[in-house]
Amino acid sequence: MAFILSFWMIFLLDSVIVLLSFVCFVCVWICALLFSTVLLVSKLNNIYCTWDFTASKFIDVYWFTIGGMFSLGLLLRLCLLLYFGHLNFVSFDLCKVVGFQWYWVYFIFGETTIFSNLILESDYMIGDLRLLQCNHVLTLLSLVIYKLWLSAVDVIHSFAISSLGVKVDCIPGRCNEIVLFSSNNATVYGQCSELCGVLHGFMPIVICFI
């Protein structure tokens, strides 16, 4: 897991999927029960019957309570996600990421500056990923917590790496913050996911955890 919040995001998504599956199962079961009951009564009376349903306070309270409990469970998980999103983790070092048209600039350790551009197709080597290779990669240490500050200079960019569960907007005049942590060595790829101009699809992101 590389992004601190990715665990809680996956946990929340799994909870929603389980809840939706349970609700769908209950709805299908109730529909099947009603349909089979209507058919059974119709065959016994040899007519197509219509029923007059009356209100039931017990059923209203029951369904309201069950639905409220499910909603409360999802709300608590969402509150945990928001809490960890604003929690200040003790980080080993700081990395600044600035988006330009159409490349990324990384400021590492307060003094190292890396300009990351898309390499030309003529410079590709065997095994390189098209539109995902850049001339300089962001190299970070695994098992180390990093704090990333993200901003932009010209237009709105989006620092997105799907394998890490990361998608943060880089807005001129504003500094957004995320925390990265990798438990193993890996190389991850991403791109700018904001329509930032004619070369929007040519801003690759490569992070190598060593």
Swiss-Prot record:
Annotated catalysed reactions: 4 Fe(II)-[cytochrome c] + O2 + 8 H(+)(in) = 4 Fe(III)-[cytochrome c] + 2 H2O + 4 H(+)(out)
Nuclease as UniProt keyword: no
Ligand binding (Cu cation A1): H157, C192, C196, M203
Enzyme Commission numbers on file: 7.1.1.9
Membrane topology: Multi-pass membrane protein
GO molecular function terms listed in the Swiss-Prot or TrEMBL record: copper ion binding; cytochrome-c oxidase activity
Protein's name according to its UniProt entry: Cytochrome c oxidase subunit 2
Organism: Leishmania tarentolae
